[in-house]
From Swiss-Prot:
It catalyses: [(1->4)-alpha-D-glucosyl](n) + ADP-alpha-D-glucose = [(1->4)-alpha-D-glucosyl](n+1) + ADP + H(+). The keyword Transmembrane helix does not apply. Pathway: Glycan biosynthesis; glycogen biosynthesis. GO terms for biological process: glycogen biosynthetic process. This is Glycogen synthase. HAMAP family: Glycogen_synth (MF_00484). It is an enzyme of class 2 (transferase). One of its GO terms (molecular function) is alpha-1,4-glucan glucosyltransferase (UDP-glucose donor) activity. Synthesizes alpha-1,4-glucan chains using ADP-glucose. One of its GO terms (cellular component) is cytosol. Belongs to the glycosyltransferase 1 family. Bacterial/plant glycogen synthase subfamily.
Amino acid sequence: MQVLHVCSEMFPLLKTGGLADVIGALPAAQIADGVDARVLLPAFPDIRRGVTDAQVVSRRDTFAGHITLLFGHYNGVGIYLIDAPHLYDRPGSPYHDTNLFAYTDNVLRFALLGWVGAEMASGLDPFWRPDVVHVHDWHAGLAPAYLAARGRPAKSVFTVHNLAYQGMFYAHHMNDIQLPWSFFNIHGLEFNGQISFLKAGLYYADHITAVSPTYAREITEPQFAYGMEGLLQQRHREGRLSGVLNGVDEKIWSPETDLLLASRYTRDTLEDKAENKSQLQIAMGLKVDDKVPLFAVVSRLTSQKGLDLVLEALPGLLEQGGQLALLGAGDPVLQEGFLAAAAEYPGQVGVQIGYHEAFSHRIMGGADVILVPSRFEPCGLTQLYGLKYGTLPLVRRTGGLADTVSDCSLENLADGVASGFVFEDSNAWSLLRAIRRAFVLWSRPSLWRFVQRQAMAMDFSWQVAAKSYRELYYRLK
């Protein structure tokens, strides 16, 4: 079984979000599971530099200009690169310029990614041809459409990491991307009078997966579907929509081997976590005190992530004696709000604006509770890292958060399945009640330790996801 992943980023070569973590880990897990998985990426500067053994496979003139297809390896995974400097050789973000404006030629930059993905199924590399083209998010969404236009030389799977990003472009670009105008249709890639790369993936793929079972159900409902509910309800009825939970890359995220921690630990040596907490308190300008619970946020600061709720609930958290360490960037209003809180409550609130992968490990190793109060969350990796590190997740019951965290209710504690704190409603009062439950459990150290051990024993390895995808691919053949 030969599978080509088509996507725009891959950790650690290039990362703007959780998609990169998935592509950095899933193909390697699939190879270990007996699937010949490779990855197709645009040759953005950081990616091109990272794949040092890239050799020329093919050269083509395309609707988006001349391209060179390269093939090399990274961490044991075969990587195809679309080398087109006029499209991809730009500093900074792969999606927008330094003023945060989307590049005006994104329609060509990402149509080309989908086109090359489909061409791979028609022999662009004469020595390797995928049985399944596995496409991720809107950037690669045209690949199933190009496959359909080609008579479907391979099966296709489209994975939705976040339905909110739809890849919308003006209709006149149908003239530029080498797809039949007949595809610009409600039964096709047309959405609200525009081309939607996301809808192309959803409509033309043989199967759609979402990154958690709950998110797969949620996206058939209007409040989560951004207008795609009709199509997604139809795919659900046809048995062509399912959820496969993301995993954790244990080579990178494991408190036992994590060299970024001051003190490594296991579920049997949890007392060694205390050193990480005091180091984190020092680094964040917090009062060093192992008796108070340290709550943490590692997140984009947006209302999707529910960070406005954290700001609203913060006085209540601090009144009970808690501390907050926050790492993130995003909405300027939220940034200002958290910086003001840090100034108002020195020693209790520490804020670092920005994102540093290494520091996120130190927070995960040192905090007691990780807050993930998202309004929607397709899968969420942060809470999985929290479980792995015995940093109990406090989450809203939505998407992947609902699938991965069990509340510390009395019955869950009795059944030995409790692993964190879960609240229902997207408001500060509901969040504060969950924070209150965290304080109650914190006052029972032996019970807290019991829940930490439960959390750390859970298996969210990529091997589980790799097996689910393999079974799906064979069903499609």
